[in-house]
Curated annotation (Swiss-Prot):
Biological pathway: Pyrimidine metabolism; UMP biosynthesis via de novo pathway; UMP from orotate: step 1/2
Catalytic function, reaction form: orotidine 5'-phosphate + diphosphate = orotate + 5-phospho-alpha-D-ribose 1-diphosphate
Organism lineage: Eukaryota, Fungi, Dikarya, Ascomycota, Saccharomycotina
Record EC number: 2.4.2.10
Role description: Catalyzes the transfer of a ribosyl phosphate group from 5-phosphoribose 1-diphosphate to orotate, leading to the formation of orotidine monophosphate (OMP).
Disulphide-bonded residues: none
Keyword field contains RNA-binding: no
Keywords annotated in UniProt: Glycosyltransferase, Pyrimidine biosynthesis, Transferase
Subunit composition and interactions: Homodimer.
Gene Ontology cellular component annotations, sorted alphabetically: cytoplasm
Protein name: Orotate phosphoribosyltransferase
Gene Ontology biological process terms from the UniProt entry: 'de novo' pyrimidine nucleobase biosynthetic process; 'de novo' UMP biosynthetic process; pyrimidine ribonucleoside biosynthetic process
Residues holding orotate: 38-39, 136, 164
UniProt KW Glycosyltransferase keyword: yes
Length: 226
């Protein structure tokens, strides 16, 4: 029996569909897989959409009860996410989130002015939450870990908007999704606003039987074990 979606998750999915950030059809992914859905968080590109997106991230973070000092957004997509979610946490998260800081990396290190590779809060001796849109192969978070380790920070978790719950090719004998692989490799929780199971549950009755069957078939073919 699927877990009932919370209001913030329903709102997120509704806006994702309205903005066409979440689309259905036939899409060839970088992996070569043909997916019945495609997710592009970049289409959350208005003040209203960004505010609602930040609320969804913030509620997921608050409910996790994860303790951290800095939200780190890997360049480029993670940069606006880190800043808007930092603001939203201060607005709705109560006193313990008032002093949460944010930071992001430059793609090219700056050799003048303040210099360095990090913009925003210093990462040294800080507990870091990495924020991003999706996690496909885990490449971006691996790079983020290297950057944060170089700055002597400690990653305590990661959060993404959508967990596709798809298997990836790993060196492990286990068949794991990207989020499961990262969680196991770094021993951290990987949070998400929604996952593929949530999408399928939400769409029940909202799409045709044929479209739902394609979603279910895709999950059966590429889905990782819970």
């Amino acid at each position: 029996m699927p877990t009932a979606l919370e209001d913030y998750q329903k709102n997120f999915l509704e806006l994702a569909i309205e903005s066409k950030a979440l689309r259905f059809g036939e899409f060839t992914l970088k992996s070569g897989r043909v997916s019945p859905y495609f997710f592009n968080l970049g289409l959350f590109n208005t003040g209203k959409l960004l505010s609602n997106l930040a609320t969804a991230y913030a509620i997921a973070i608050i409910q996790s009860e994860l303790k951290f000092d800095v939200i780190f957004g890997p360049a480029y997509k993670g940069i606006p996410l880190a800043s808007i979610v930092c603001v939203k946490l201060a607005e709705i998260g109560g006193s313990k989130f008032q002093d949460v800081k944010y930071a992001f990396n430059r793609k090219e290190a700056k050799d003048h002015g303040e210099g360095g590779n990090i913009v925003g809060a210093a990462l040294k001796d800080q507990k870091i939450l990495i924020i991003d849109d999706v996690m496909t192969a885990g490449t971006a978070i691996n790079e983020a870990f290297e950057i944060i380790a170089k700055e002597e920070g400690k990653v305590v978790g990661s959060i993404i908007a959508l967990d596709r719950q798809e298997v990836v090719n790993t060196e492990d004998t286990e068949v794991l999704s990207a989020t499961q692989s990262v969680s196991k490799r770094y021993d951290i929780p990987v949070l998400s606003i929604v996952n593929l199971s949530n999408i399928i549950s939400y769409l029940d009755g909202r799409i045709s039987v044929e479209e739902r069957e394609k979603m279910e078939q895709y999950r059966q073919t590429y889905g990782a074990s819970a």
